[in-house]
C-alpha cells in the first residue's frame, strides 16, 4: 500500500541512507518538473512487487483505488483522471519486456503442468493463484514479447491466453497467439463469459 503522500517513501528511504538520485534511478521517485527535488511515484495505490525469476524484487506496479467515506484523513479519494495502473519505468534492473509477473512463484507448476495461463493484470494473476491455477503469469501492462515467450518455452509446450474480454483484450489475444506460434507453442484461448476479466470470473464463481 502506498499512502496518499508526495514524500512518504522518499523520506523513509532517505532515513535508510539512500540519496534522492538513487531513489529516482530505482524508478520509485520522479524528478520535479519545476525546481529541484523528487517526489513519490506511487501515491494512494495498492502495490504489487515485481520479482525477477529468482524472486528478487526489481520493480513495482500500483493500482489506484478510491477510499470509502470515513477512512483515515491522510488518505483521500483518487483523481479519476489518473491511470488505473502505473509501473516502475525502465531501470538498470527492470526491463518490462523480459519480466512476467509471478513467474518466480509459478515456474515450477508451469513445468509440472506443461502449460501456462497468460493473463493481463496483477489482480487477474493473484485471483487465479488463489483459485488454484498456480501456473498463471501476467504480462502486466505490456504487449507479450519474444523474450517472455522464450522464458515460457523452456518450461512448457502449451500457452493458454486468458486476457480481458474487451476490445483491447481480444486484440492482445490475437497478437499473443500469433507470436506464440513462432515459438511452436500449442495454443489455447480461455473464453470467459461471466465477467470482463479473469479476476471478475474468479470472484463470481
Model regions and ranges:
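Conserved phosphate-handling catalytic cores of large alpha/beta enzymes
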Residues: 144-205
Amino acid at each position: 500500500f502506498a499512502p496518499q503522500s508526495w514524500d512518504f517513501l522518499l523520506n523513509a528511504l532517505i532515513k535508510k541512507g539512500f540519496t534522492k538520485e538513487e531513489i529516482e534511478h530505482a524508478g520509485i521517485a520522479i524528478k520535479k518538473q519545476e525546481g529541484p527535488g523528487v517526489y513519490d511515484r506511487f501515491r494512494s495505490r495498492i502495490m504489487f512487487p515485481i520479482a525477477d525469476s529468482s524472486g528478487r524484487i526489481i520493480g513495482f506496479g500500483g493500482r489506484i483505488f478510491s477510499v470509502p467515506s470515513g477512512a483515515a484523513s491522510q488518505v483521500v479519494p483518487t483523481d479519476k483522471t489518473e491511470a488505473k495502473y502505473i509501473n516502475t519505468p525502465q531501470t538498470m534492473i527492470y526491463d518490462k519486456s523480459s519480466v512476467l509477473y509471478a513467474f518466480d512463484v509459478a515456474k515450477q507448476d508451469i513445468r509440472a503442468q506443461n502449460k501456462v495461463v497468460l493473463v493481463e493484470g496483477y489482480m487477474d494473476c493473484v485471483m487465479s493463484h488463489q483459485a488454484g491455477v498456480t501456473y498463471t503469469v501476467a504480462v502486466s501492462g505490456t504487449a507479450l514479447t519474444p523474450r517472455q515467450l522464450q522464458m515460457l518455452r523452456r518450461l512448457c509446450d502449451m500457452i493458454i491466453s486468458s486476457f480481458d474480454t474487451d476490445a483491447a483484450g481480444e486484440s492482445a489475444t490475437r497478437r499473443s497467439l500469433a507470436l506464440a506460434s513462432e515459438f511452436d507453442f500449442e495454443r489455447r484461448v480461455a473464453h470467459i463469459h461471466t465477467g470482463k476479466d479473469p479476476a471478475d470470473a474468479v470472484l463470481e464463481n
